[in-house]
Design a protein with these regions (language model features):
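Soluble extramembrane regions of membrane proteins in the secretory/endomembrane system
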Residues: 58, 62, 68-70, 75-79, ...
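Activation targets extended, charge/polar-rich intrinsically disordered C-terminal tails
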Residues: 140-184, 189-496
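N-terminal secretory signal peptides that target proteins for export/translocation
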Residues: 1-23
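Sec/Tat signal peptide C-region and signal peptidase I cleavage site
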Residues: 39-45
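Short His-Asn-centered micro-motif
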Residues: 51-52, 72, 207-210
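Bacterial N-terminal signal peptides
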Residues: 25-39
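Short, surface-exposed beta-edge/turn micro-motifs
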Residues: 46, 66-67
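N-terminal post-signal-peptidase region of extra-cytosolic proteins
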Residues: 49-58
């Protein structure tokens, strides 16, 4: 779902107002206060660490350590290798280091716009709703042409999947991530800009002593000395992404004036393999069968030590931190127009952002009931295999704004379906294919565990889009409108 993180606005963090019999009379004043708090004025800045989930590739397949990057709300990319302060309305940036960025020069780091990092597009309204490598590669090529002129001229950079600049484009298509954010100052940002713009950008990546987590740790400690550190015991002397996220979070909790917020970006449903939870070193030894079994056989005497080390000092659950300090990635204008704004204002906003288990269960039951009642429709029948069929038979393309399309051959002709938030219900998008796509997407979201799905506020918008798609598909088929076209009231519960 969209993120509009203006450099002049904080992420929205909820707190539960006191309930009272006069809440109806206080609602207008409360909404004015809420919207004023969300207004695009801000005098300070933010920095955050991004904990990226683990991919089943390379050394990550063994270590399960994932990846780490750093987020700035007031620092933007002048080029992928140069900082500047953001202009009003810009959404900040993400900076990261890799083993091999793969560009003409061996750079240590690149910096990209936040929404490009998350979705592969500048405006999140054009974010993809369907994850496939065809779409991701099309977004990568668009990014290369628009941003890497003069930096990516070699055949290896342009065509090799080993060039890791690609991981900084539409990352949510390949992995989920958590963003831990605190307040900083513009003065701190200016100092960092001067430091990095004047320092050599030379790659010295080393997995043991100078990896992505070391890189983020040093940047965070520039803002807040000793805020992030390695876990020598649980990561065997190295720095892991999870250790940096854990120590940074604990530091922020000891300093409430930093206003800790946590955001969760779920991996986009589709045909790309699901990413995995990030793990510390001892945690991976205990949870990975391919490591635990050999250890139990050949080094069984060390197993109790490893278990005790992890249980006592190494545990950290990003999802629980999100539930404690949730921030929404919905922009103020989306909140203001949301039919759920009143309930967000008057109920526990943490529950409203994360979603109560009872509310999710009610949506699952409603979805299953409606699918059963419409089981004869082709869209309902195809939903379990739709992603695979769309990926296998479709040809991906992206427009100048990054909005993605899939074109399929049909009866000697072709038909197109929009696979971005901005075009899935467009006039040019086939209504029945669009409905099938949103059915498959909704089904995947509702089947996902809580650490694999988006927020409840975002899902409310998903449900509204599904209703519109249902009505459009029913009109195209010309039968009676689908029962999914009505809004199903869901009562929230405070139980997770």
């Amino acid at each position: 779902m969209p993120i509009s993180v203006s450099n002049r606005r904080r992420f929205t963090l909820g707190h539960a107002p006191d309930a009272s019999p006069s809440r109806a009379s206080l609602l207008p004043l409360f909404l004015v206060t809420l919207l004023f708090a969300l207004a695009p004025f801000r005098a300070s800045a933010d920095v955050g660490v991004i904990l990226n989930e683990s991919l089943d590739e390379s050394m990550d397949r063994i270590t399960g350590s994932g990846h780490m990057a750093v987020y700035f709300s007031r620092i933007c990319a002048d080029t992928p290798t140069k900082f500047r302060l953001c202009a009003p309305g810009e959404s900040g940036s993400v900076m990261s280091t890799y083993i091999n960025i793969g560009e003409n020069h061996s750079f240590q780091w690149n910096i990209v716009p936040l929404n490009v990092y998350l979705y592969g597009v500048e405006d999140p309204v054009n974010r993809p709703l369907f994850a496939s490598y065809k779409i991701k590669h099309a977004l990568e090529e668009r990014y290369r042409q628009n941003y890497l002129a003069g930096l990516c001229d070699t055949p290896a950079c342009q065509t090799s999947n080993k060039s890791e600049w690609r991981e900084m484009v539409a990352s949510t298509l390949i992995r989920g991530m958590y963003l831990f954010i605190v307040d900083t100052s513009v003065e701190q940002d200016r100092a960092l800009i001067v430091e990095f713009n004047n320092a050599p950008n030379e790659n010295h990546f080393n997995g043991a002593t100078n990896n992505c987590a070391d890189f983020v740790r040093r940047i965070v400690n520039t803002y807040f000395p000793h805020a992030a550190s390695r876990d020598v015991l649980n990561d065997f002397g190295m720095t892991s992404p999870k250790a940096v996220a854990r120590t940074f979070t604990h530091y922020a909790q000891r300093h409430p004036e930093l206003n800790l917020r946590v955001m969760h970006f779920a991996q986009v449903p589709g045909t790309i393999k699901r990413s995995r939870d990030v793990r510390a070193g001892t945690e991976q030894l205990l949870r990975s069968k391919k490591l635990l079994i050999p250890m139990a056989v050949f080094a069984y005497e060390a197993l109790p030590v490893v278990a005790a080390s992890y249980v006592i000092t190494g545990r950290f659950n990003p999802e629980k931190e999100f539930e404690k300090h949730p921030a929404t990635n919905l922009a103020p204008e989306n909140l203001a127009s949301s039919p759920h704004l009143q309930s967000v204002a008057l109920q526990d906003q943490r529950t409203q952002i994360v979603g109560a288990s009872a509310e999710w269960n009610n949506y699952r039951k409603a979805f299953d009931t409606e699918i059963e009642e419409n089981r004869d429709s082709p869209e309902a029948l195809d939903r379990s295999h739709f992603f695979k069929l769309l990926d296998e038979k479709g040809t991906a393309s992206v427009g100048s704004d990054g909005s993605a399309w899939m074109q399929l051959s049909e009866n000697g002709g072709s038909v197109s379906v929009g696979v971005s938030a901005s075009n899935v219900l467009a006039q040019e998008s086939d209504p029945q294919l669009a409905y099938s796509l949103l059915l498959a997407r909704t089904s995947a979201l509702l089947k996902s565990p809580k650490h694999r799905r988006e927020t409840m506020l975002e899902f409310h918008q998903e449900w509204a889009n599904l209703q519109r798609a249902s009505a459009a598909a029913a009109s195209a088929r010309n039968p009676a409108p689908s029962k999914l076209a009505r809004l199903i009231p869901i009562e929230a519960s405070a139980t997770f």
